[in-house]
Amino acid sequence: MRIFIIKSSTAHTAFDYSIKDIPGTSGRLDLICRSLNAAFQLSHSFRKNVRVYTVLYGPPDPPKTIRFEGAKIKPKTLNPDEVSTAKLIGKILNAGKDIKEPTKEREVLPGIYISRMTFEDVVRKNIKYNLYLLEENGVDIEKVKFPQDNVGFILGDQNGFTEEELNFLEGLVPKITIGPKPYLTSHVIAFVNIYLDRIGIP
């Protein structure tokens, strides 16, 4: 299984944004929509071997974490276009309005869950799955020997990670990179998926 943990410092945590202007009103939730597309969508099929956590820290009610389980998501629930994905995320956020317990997940749709887990909670929960932090100054991905069972990747948004978050991750997960420049999160996910396909990692 492949796991992607995407932390957004700005994406809204309530359905208070306009579908007509997702980038301008949602705290760059469009980045999350494109990342989900890159994680799951193939030309004529859907990746069932992928799990994605989107950890949202934008206003008005952070944190909110949405977990997407590719193996359980029903066909046509998660589509390639940003608008339908933004609507879906809005529906999920509405369903999680009244969640109080920090780590209790609520299944909103088959394979899609919402909780109040923090970024640190999500990392700790998945640390057994061989996590890697994707950063420009990491080890070249081509030099990494990945395990054949489960592997996970931690990615930031347009703002990256706070110093506190980097300190938390230091020594906990190794840093790797796909290249020397700051790439779009969705492009990094697409590259990682293609690279793992090429080297035969499930």
Swiss-Prot record:
Binding residue positions for S-adenosyl-L-methionine: 134, 156
Keywords, alphabetical: Cytoplasm, Methyltransferase, S-adenosyl-L-methionine, Transferase, tRNA processing
Reaction(s) catalysed (UniProt annotation): pseudouridine(54) in tRNA + S-adenosyl-L-methionine = N(1)-methylpseudouridine(54) in tRNA + S-adenosyl-L-homocysteine + H(+)
Any one GO molecular-function label of the UniProt entry: S-adenosylmethionine-dependent methyltransferase activity
GO cellular component, one term: cytoplasm
GO biological process: tRNA methylation
Protein origin, superkingdom: Archaea
Similarity field: Belongs to the methyltransferase superfamily. TrmY family.
Protein name: tRNA (pseudouridine(54)-N(1))-methyltransferase
